[in-house]
Amino acid sequence: RITEMIPERNEQGQTLWSKMNDAGSDRVMVSPLAVTWWNRNGPITNTVHYPKIYKTYFERVERLKHGTFGPVHFRNQVKIRRRVDINPGHADLSAKEAQDVIMEVVFPNEVGARILTSESQLTITK
């Protein structure tokens, strides 16, 4: 198929494919230049399906064009960073400290609300 559609040499006389058999298979050897030639001179098909394939990309571009970015909040970075500075290397955080860091990262707004004991939890739910 390739040999029917792509010439053996391009305009500069560089070989695009040769009739020498590829070792171990009965196919012709094709140069990477053939791809370039095809991209430049190959048949042009309709581009209707591109948006379908790159749907997410196109949608994202559209969103970015019309997008507004709300206020971005960075909270509690300092606290966590300081904690990391105090424990350099692989000194493991104590279970409690690890819990604190996780809580700070996962629930940034709840910082300072200590993990409630089951009793106080009960009274609240009551």
From Swiss-Prot:
It comes from the Viruses. Its main location: virion. One of its GO terms (biological process) is cap snatching. Pfam families: Flu_PB2_2nd, Flu_PB2_3rd. One of its GO terms (cellular component) is virion component. It is found in: Virion; Host nucleus; Host mitochondrion. Keywords: Cap snatching, Eukaryotic host gene expression shutoff by virus, Eukaryotic host transcription shutoff by virus, Host gene expression shutoff by virus, Host mitochondrion, Host nucleus, Host-virus interaction, Inhibition of host innate immune response by virus, Inhibition of host MAVS by virus, Inhibition of host RLR pathway by virus, Inhibition of host RNA polymerase II by virus, mRNA capping, mRNA processing, Viral immunoevasion, Viral transcription, Virion. The keyword Transcription does not apply. Belongs to the influenza viruses PB2 family. Plays an essential role in transcription initiation and cap-stealing mechanism, in which cellular capped pre-mRNAs are used to generate primers for viral transcription. Binds the cap of the target pre-RNA which is subsequently cleaved after 10-13 nucleotides by PA. Plays a role in the initiation of the viral genome replication and modulates the activity of the ribonucleoprotein (RNP) complex. In addition, participates in the inhibition of type I interferon induction through interaction with the host mitochondrial antiviral signaling protein MAVS. Influenza RNA polymerase is composed of three subunits: PB1, PB2 and PA. Interacts (via N-terminus) with PB1 (via C-terminus). Interacts with nucleoprotein NP (via N-terminus). Interacts (via N-terminus) with host MAVS (via N-terminus); this interaction inhibits host innate immune response. This is Polymerase basic protein 2. It comes from Influenza A virus (strain A/Camel/Mongolia/1982 H1N1). The gene is PB2.
